[in-house]
Amino acid sequence: LLFIAALGLTVAVGADQKLKRPNILYIIVDDQSPFDFKFYNQRSQLDAPVIEKLAAEGMVIDGAYQMGAWVGGVCTASRHMIMSGRTVWHIPDRPFRKPPANPNALNPKLVPPDLVRNTLAAVFNRAGYDTMRTCKRGNSYDDANKQFTVVHDATKRGGTAETGSAWHAERVLDYLGEREKAKDEDPFLIYFGFSHPHDVRDGTPELLEKYGAVNHRDKDTLPPANSKQPNLPINWLPEHPFHHGHPGLRDAVKVPGVWERRDERTIRNEIGRQFACSEYIDQQIGRVLAKLKAMGELDNTYIVYTADHGMAIGRHGLQGKQNLYEHTWRVPFVVKGPGIKPGSRAQGNVYLLDTLATLCGLAGIKPPTTNEGLSLKPVLMGRAQTIRDTLFGVYCGGTKPGMRSVRRGDWKLIKYDVMDGTVRKTQLFNLKENPNEFIREHHGLRKFVKPNRNALNLADNPKFADKRKEMEELLLKEMRRLNDPHRLWDQPKN
């Protein structure tokens, strides 16, 4: 009898443990710089109380990056990396593009033909999780998205509940309501994606009014000035000092409300629109978190907040996401959940491609053998500050070989080899002393406090010649390690 009782106790405990497997709510927005938020940028005027509360109750990662892209739609490469856990040169392209924008995409030694079987939802399905997603359509890893058991995708960038971000929240709320009604106790992975604040940034009338912005449609006029509009970014420029390397790029010339303008009125209005869309997203996240709390699931749920890449909107005289400055290469990254110390911060040095390994680690699932990412769990649990010491970035969606970046510690190198060799530039920044990556052109502006005289591109300063050489050698090493098919003008061809 004692043996039977003990056996029954073991079974009961085992079942209870199974019920307590953590849920995951992965929130991802489209086109958002980390510097939109006060917890990354004290100058920001965005109100995002729900996300700010997540940051206060969880961990903020100061060094979260997306590795880059080989196509103008940066989100395509970014979302392939998120879903697969693989590096930028080891992922497929969308099937319609022939030849693929990634020259390695059809090489089975670098991109496994059956990769989709080992993408995020497929892995969690096999582990007994219920999987659901809502997000925008297009510029994504379509076959991986289909692995989610429940899929509600649509592009919603309007200013009403039906045409905007509330639509995505409703899909999640409906899903949670159905689980509650069915008394479904399986753990869940919800990929809670938004179409905003990617343009067209049509906010709700109330939030547009709050930020002094209008949905400007007339290409021949400037939007009205309004004192409520957010201030210009501290590293705003009226134009970038040299060509970014992608002629005719949509984000540089065709975004409604901005087009090719970088003047103060246009940029402040567009940031107001960005903030209106972002605060509306914040409200929708709050609705979902309230539902989880009412269901008794909130404390057993890991919540991740991030974006598929950053965004310029006037910073350095740029508009889109096709650059490697920190405002665009970096992404916001906040995690709250069991075992994470409230109000904590860490450098992290995490890529978005580490999502698969990280979520597997938090859920106690073994990552697939195709995964190349690292788990952020040691950092989230307070056992480490970073998971790697070197970060690599690429953009070559325009002229080749494009831009490359590498960061280690406080030092960052960016190299440009674009426009068929007519633009070849090197930038070297000490991010501790120059976190806004000020360049010479910033020193002549009167909009802001004049930058420190040493807050410059140091690439041509003889005092830093050794550091430049060191970083260039590190960049080449990373390009080789990651199977980058291109080489810059001053690199060996192998």
Short names for language-model regions:
Residues 1-10:
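Bacterial N-terminal signal peptides
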Residues 9-20:
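Bacterial Sec-dependent signal peptides at the C-terminal "C-region" and cleavage site
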Residues 15, 26-27, 33-119, 123-135, ...:
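Active-site segment of extracytoplasmic enzymes that catalyze sulfate/phosphate-ester chemistry
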Residues 18-22, 29-45, 53, 62, ...:
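Active-site-proximal cap/lid insertion segments
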Residues 40-44, 60-86, 94-95, 133-144, ...:
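Short, solvent-exposed turn/loop segments enriched in Gly/Ser/Thr/Pro and often Arg
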Residues 48, 82, 136, 299-304, ...:
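Polar, surface-exposed loop/tail segments
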Residues 75-77, 143, 326-330, 371, ...:
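Short, solvent-exposed loop/turn segments at the edges of secondary structure
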Residues 409-427, 431-433:
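Low-complexity, glycine/alanine/valine/leucine- and proline-rich hydrophobic stretches
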